[in-house]
A protein has these predicted regions:
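Nucleotide-sugar-dependent
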Residues: 199, 235, 242-278, 284-293
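Carbohydrate-associated surface elements
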Residues: 151, 169
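Conserved catalytic-core segment of nucleotide-activated headgroup transferases in glycan assembly
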Residues: 11-27, 171-174, 182-250
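Conserved acidic donor-binding segment of nucleotide-sugar-dependent glycosyltransferases
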Residues: 295-308, 316-322
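Acceptor-binding helix/loop patch of EC 2.4 sugar-transfer enzymes
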Residues: 41-55, 107-136, 185, 264
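A short, well-ordered alpha-helix in the C-terminal region of glycosyltransferases
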Residues: 316, 323-338, 347-350
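C-terminal alpha-helical cap of glycosyltransferases
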Residues: 341-357
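Membrane-proximal helix-turn-helix segments that form the acceptor-binding/catalytic region
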Residues: 67-79, 90-108, 112-115, 125-144
C-alpha cells in the first residue's frame, strides 16, 4: 500500500508530526504501508511562520506553498490513498481535500480541535483565513479519521462512521523505564515543554516558590533558558531532541500545568504526560483534557488545581519514597499498555488498511 502523506511542516520539525505519523512509520513500513511525505511549508515559511510580524514574507511563502500543493494533484494516480495531517493547506477552504477525495481515499488525522475558532497570537491576521468550518467537511469526505482524544472523537463521530482513536504515542524503544531512576539523589521535580508553552509554568509559580523554599529537591525546567520566575531556585535549559530522554531521566516528579485561557486545551491529548509516565516520572497535573483520563489520582499520579494542592502533591511524593516508587511503576505500566507505539501498532495499521477495504 502506497500512501502520499500531506503534512504541514517539514519532516522532523513539528512535535505533532513527530509524535504521530512520523513515528507510526516504524510500524507501517514493516506492514507493507509506505509513506511518501509532502510538506506544505517551504523552508522560508517554516523560518518566519511563528515570528511576530513579517506579514509580507509570510503571504508570499503561503502563496508559494499553496501552489506547490496544487502540483500534488497530478501525482495522485501513483498512490493507493492520501494521508492528510490536520489540513492539506494551512489556510483556505477544503478545496484541496475535496479534489483529492474525488480520486483517492483520504486517511485524515485530527489531533487538535481545529474546528474550534482560535486566533493565533503570532499570526492573528492569517487566523481569519483559517476556515474553521472546513474541518467538519474534511471529516465527512474522508474514508478514515484518526483522532487522539475522546472529545475530538466525539466531534468526529458526528460526521464519519470510520473513526479510530489512537493516542499520541511514545516509542518504548527510546523511552525505556528504569526503576532505579526514582532512587536518584538529589530528588528532582521538573517540567518539559516548548517556548510557546513556557507560560504554563507561571501558573504554578507560587507553588514552585514554596517547594523550592523547602530545599528538599532540585527543580529542572526544560524548554527555554529563561522562565521569568522569581524566588524559585531552578535550572533552565532549552529542549533538544538529542538530550530529551536523558534530561527527563533526571526528574522523578513531572509537572503538567495547563491554563484555561486557550479554548483548545480541554480537547487535547497531553503528550507530555504520557512521555513522563513511560519513563516512570510520577505526573502531577491540572485536571483538564486527557489528564483526567491518563492520570488516575492517587494511583499513578496526582491531579492538582489550587496552589495548596500542587504543593501537597509534590511534597507528599518527595517525602514518601515507597509511594513514589509504587506510583512510578504504575505510571510506566499504564503508559506501556495504553500510550505506547508498540501497544497501538495493530490499531494504527488496521486504520490505514481500512482506507482501501
Amino acid at each position: 500500500m502506497k500512501v502520499l502523506a500531506l503534512i504541514p511542516s517539514q519532516k522532523g520539525y513539528s512535535p505533532g508530526q513527530r509524535g504521530s505519523v512520523e513515528l507510526w512509520e516504524k510500524v507501517l513500513e514493516p506492514a507493507g504501508i509506505h509513506l511518501d511525505y509532502a510538506p506544505f511549508e517551504t523552508q522560508r515559511l517554516r523560518e518566519v511562520l511563528h515570528l511576530a510580524g513579517r506579514r509580507g514574507t509570510k503571504a508570499v511563502e503561503m502563496v508559494r506553498s499553496y501552489f506547490g500543493r496544487l502540483t500534488i494533484l497530478g501525482k495522485l494516480e501513483d498512490y493507493d490513498a492520501v494521508f492528510v495531517y490536520r489540513e492539506a493547506a494551512l489556510l483556505g477552504p477544503a478545496l484541496l481535500e475535496r479534489l483529492i477525495a474525488r480520486k483517492k481515499p483520504i486517511v485524515y488525522q485530527l489531533d487538535d480541535p481545529l474546528f474550534v475558532p482560535y486566533r493565533s497570537p503570532s499570526n492573528g491576521l492569517f487566523s481569519y483565513l483559517k476556515f474553521f468550518g472546513k474541518v467538519k467537511q474534511i471529516v465527512s469526505m474522508s474514508k478514515v479519521v484518526m483522532v487522539n482524544s475522546t472529545p475530538i472523537r466525539q466531534f468526529a463521530e458526528q460526521h464519519n462512521r470510520n473513526v479510530w482513536q489512537v493516542p499520541s504515542v511514545v516509542d518504548l524503544d527510546k523511552f525505556v523505564y528504569d526503576e532505579r531512576d526514582q532512587l536518584r539523589e538529589p530528588k528532582c521535580v521538573g517540567w518539559s515543554g516548548s517556548p510557546t508553552t513556557v507560560k504554563n509554568i507561571k501558573m504554578i509559580e507560587g507553588a514552585l516558590r514554596r517547594i523550592s523554599a523547602t530545599g528538599r529537591c532540585e527543580i529542572n525546567l526544560i524548554g527555554s533558558d529563561d522562565f521569568g520566575l522569581t524566588g524559585v531556585d531552578h535550572e533552565a535549559k532549552r529542549w533538544s531532541a538529542e538530550n530529551e530522554v536523558d534530561d527527563l531521566r533526571r526528574i522523578q516528579i513531572g509537572l503538567v500545568p495547563l491554563p484555561d485561557d486557550n479554548p483548545w486545551n480541554p480537547y487535547k491529548f497531553i503528550m507530555k504526560t504520557a512521555q513522563y509516565m513511560s519513563l516512570g516520572l510520577v505526573p502531577v497535573g491540572t485536571p483538564m483534557a486527557s489528564n483526567t483520563e491518563v492520570i488516575r489520582h492517587g494511583e499513578n499520579g496526582f491531579l492538582a488545581e489550587t496552589e495548596d494542592e500542587w504543593v501537597d502533591a509534590v511534597t507528599t511524593l518527595l517525602s514518601d519514597v515507597e509511594l513514589r516508587r509504587s506510583m512510578s511503576r504504575q505510571a510506566a505500566s499504564d503508559a506501556a499498555e495504553h500510550y505506547s507505539l508498540q501497544s497501538n501498532a495493530e490499531k494504527i495499521v488496521a486504520a490505514f488498511r481500512s482506507a482501501v477495504e
